[in-house]
């Protein structure tokens, strides 16, 4: 598991190629500098592996920023205002950079949706050899991902 300083460094690097105004960059860096490990965390409740008859049924509910999500069969659906939609990263990015002030949740949501876009809308990978689901490495670099497996 990466240290909190590693996450901070990686999050700052995320913004290095965005050609930010110095004031905006300083504001973002100040927020990142004050984050704790818990702020970088995504907790996912995952599938039941004891149900071998029909195979693993991945599902989860988790929160990143103020976006609540459900994960079904490794596809990610965002739920806002009781409507389902798949995030449009570029639309969100434009909204983000038009803002004049930011909070931790805004930054989390931007980085998460960017990674999600890069990963072709899959956060989880199925490891067939070990019959389990794993988090893609790109997410581990930016978030402290905790995968909780529930059996029923």
Curated annotation (Swiss-Prot):
It comes from the Viruses. This is Uncharacterized protein 293R.
